[in-house]
């Protein structure tokens, strides 16, 4: 089911010194958990993991993990990042089964140029990622939305999306995905106050005295 390989090493302890040593040697500490494996503390090579995350499928890549000779199909479930340097400090892997549906998040990509753009329409992309449910081997790289037919004032909602067979989107059907709006022209500035003519100003002062 998975064609991307990743080697992992079991680690029996999780002391600060062991974790620091793993990172200093180019590794990333992590955990694999699932129905059939329980929870296992592991470490993986940082470069190998970054290559997987940088691929087209990214975190939704099905990984054939070799854990000291034991093969498990897993996916990246969560990452703990170093906020200062944006390095991965810890990774959680979830074991998956080819017969069990899972939930994950995939990007929503817009395709085409709306008709209304020529009339001054502006694209408003509201839903940039969507939560889906499907079997692991049916996870699409992205949901592509054809917006070429949109005119000013048109919108597309989750219920309008065309999904691959076996894929269910979990976002609310009425959630707006994309729309074509117009930018309001700035209202003209107020007319500057015109000072009264000298004669009118003098007349006004005379009336005030009376």
UniProtKB/Swiss-Prot annotation:
Tagged with keyword Transferase: no
Lineage: Bacteria, Bacillati, Bacillota, Clostridia, Eubacteriales
Presence of keyword Repeat: no
Superkingdom of the organism of origin: Bacteria
Coiled coil: none
Species: Desulforamulus reducens (strain ATCC BAA-1160 / DSM 100696 / MI-1) (Desulfotomaculum reducens)
Record's keyword terms, sorted: Ribonucleoprotein, Ribosomal protein, RNA-binding, rRNA-binding
GO terms of molecular function: 5S rRNA binding; structural constituent of ribosome
Record-linked NCBIfam families: bL25_bact_ctc
Stated name of the protein: Large ribosomal subunit protein bL25
């Amino acid at each position: 089911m998975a064609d991307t390989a990743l080697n992992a090493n079991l680690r029996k302890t999780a002391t600060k010194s062991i974790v620091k040593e793993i990172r200093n040697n180019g590794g990333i500490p992590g955990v694999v958990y699932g129905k059939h494996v329980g929870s296992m503390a592991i470490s993986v090579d940082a470069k190998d993991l970054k290559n997987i995350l940088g691929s087209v499928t990214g975190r939704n890549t099905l990984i054939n993990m070799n854990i000291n000779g034991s093969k498990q199909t897993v996916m990246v479930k969560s990452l703990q990042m170093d906020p200062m340097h944006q390095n991965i400090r810890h990774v959680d892997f979830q074991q998956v089964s080819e017969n069990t549906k899972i939930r994950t998040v995939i990007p929503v990509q817009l395709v085409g140029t709306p008709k209304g753009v020529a009339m001054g329409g502006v694209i408003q992309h509201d839903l940039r990622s969507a939560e889906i449910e499907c079997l692991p081997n049916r996870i699409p790289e992205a949901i592509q939305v054809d917006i070429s037919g949109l005119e000013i004032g048109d919108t597309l909602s989750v219920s309008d999306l065309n999904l691959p067979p076996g894929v269910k989107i979990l976002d609310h059907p009425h959630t707006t995905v994309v729309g074509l709006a117009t930018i309001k022209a700035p209202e003209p500035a107020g007319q500057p106050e015109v000072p009264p003519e000298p004669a009118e100003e003098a007349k006004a002062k005379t009336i005030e005295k009376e």
